Swiss-Prot record:
EC number annotated for this UniProt entry: 2.1.2.10
InterPro entries: GCS_T, GCS_T_bac, GCST_C, GCV_T_N, GcvT/YgfZ/DmdA, GcvT/YgfZ_C, TrmE/GcvT_dom1
Gene Ontology molecular-function annotations: aminomethyltransferase activity; transaminase activity
Protein name: Aminomethyltransferase
Function statement: The glycine cleavage system catalyzes the degradation of glycine.
Family: Belongs to the GcvT family.
SUPFAM superfamilies: Aminomethyltransferase beta-barrel domain, Folate-binding domain
């Protein structure tokens, strides 16, 4: 049965085109995916991301539990509200999910995990938590709204209780605080996102979500759908679980080495496989590619290199760049001469560093300059 967020009727009233996304009835756009993309890059847009799963972890040994569970090290989290992006691995080093973990207190951490992986994540986390006597609490009572873009933070801060605006204005990146709106709505305000733009991801009680969404609308923040969210995140060089990595792919094979902390004295699930792969080298690599010819890069297209064949993972037409961009997984080795098979024709590709776009501008080399 398709699930609906608390904002479903609101999306329909705004004229959204709804699609099935991982078992959820979600807005793909509200008229123009292109306009919504540019709105976020140039001003501010908001997304209903209530399909994401919030998981609260409680217990005296919750930090020790997360040191074991996650490939990145929660020992980096020492200030209340600080956050960390990390992968959660299986014993073979494959990525069960990528997630954000927030440090709330020594006996309370919060995770935000992907919607499509909810059931397997909760099962895995629950199984591992038993050894540490950690209580796992799924917060299905929450909704989540992401407000993203150069003017996103200012628009949200205008809606906060005046007593909280100074703290919200000073909030650093990858940090969160508990605050409230002018109307007294309790808000978990995180300076994070999935677009490459500044902004907030806001966790709030479901029963308050429609009112807060409408308050943002009244501020002039326009809604954006999952279509724009996908083109924005790929331009920003951000991964999509299930497309760019999965439980058969290690972080080293997904260009996520920066999320691995091989700190001394910490044995986390999957560590031994990662240590071996780091020493020997991964057999494949995730790279960013640009196609200068006309056309669109799509998931599953074959990519040819001097070292063998790979494939396109996430691919799209970049509204900011006016070119097709993609992630590709190809064999380890040279990536100087790349071609993609598009309907039987081999078309040249250029390998580039990602993100493709930062602060609304093409990164050096992406446009071929």
């Amino acid at each position: 049965m398709t699930q609906k967020t608390i904002l479903n009727d609101t999306h329909r009233a705004l004229g959204a085109k709804m699609v099935d996304f991982g078992g959820w009835d979600m807005p793909i756009h509200y008229g123009s995916q292109l306009d919504e993309h540019h709105q976020v890059r140039r001003d501010a847009g908001m997304f209903d991301v209530s399909h994401m799963t919030v998981v609260d972890l409680h217990g005296a040994r919750v930090r020790a539990f997360l040191r074991d569970l996650l490939a990145n090290s929660v020992d980096k989290l020492k200030v209340c509200g600080k956050a960390l992006y990390t992968c959660m691995l299986n014993p073979q080093g494959g990525v069960i999910d990528d997630l954000i973990v927030y440090y709330m207190s020594e006996d309370f951490f919060r995770l935000v995990v992907n919607a499509a992986t909810r059931e397997k994540d909760l099962q895995w986390i629950g199984e591992q938590a038993v050894r540490f006597d950690v209580r796992v609490e799924e917060r299905s009572d929450f909704a989540m709204i992401a407000v993203q873009g150069p003017n996103a933070r200012a628009n949200v801060i205008d809606l906060l209780d005046p007593a909280d605006t100074a703290a919200a204005s000073k909030l650093g990146r990858f940090a969160a605080l508990q605050t409230r709106s002018r109307d007294g709505i309790e808000l978990f305000l995180a300076r994070t996102g999935y677009t490459g733009e500044d902004g907030f991801e806001i966790v709030l009680p479901q029963e308050a979500a429609v009112a807060f969404w409408n308050a943002l609308l009244a501020q002039g923040v326009k809604p954006a759908g999952l279509g724009a969210r996908d083109t924005l995140r790929l331009e920003a060089g951000m991964h999509l679980y299930g497309q760019d990595m999965d439980d058969a792919v290690t972080p080293y094979e997904a260009a996520l080495a920066w999320t691995i902390a091989l700190d001394e004295g910490r044995d986390f699930i999957g560590r031994r496989v990662l240590e071996s792969q780091k020493a020997q080298g991964a057999p494949c690599q995730l790279i960013g590619v640009v196609m200068d010819d006309k056309g669109v890069l799509r998931h599953g297209q074959a990519v040819f290199t001097a070292s063998g064949e790979g494939e396109i993972l996430s691919g799209t037409f970049s509204p900011t760049l006016g070119k097709a961009i993609a992630f590709a997984r190809v064999p380890a080795g040279s990536i100087d001469q790349l071609r993609v098979d598009i309907r039987g024709k081999q078309v040249p590709l250029r390998a580039v560093k990602f993100p493709f776009v930062r602060d609304g501008q093409a990164q050096p080399g992406v446009l071929g300059d």
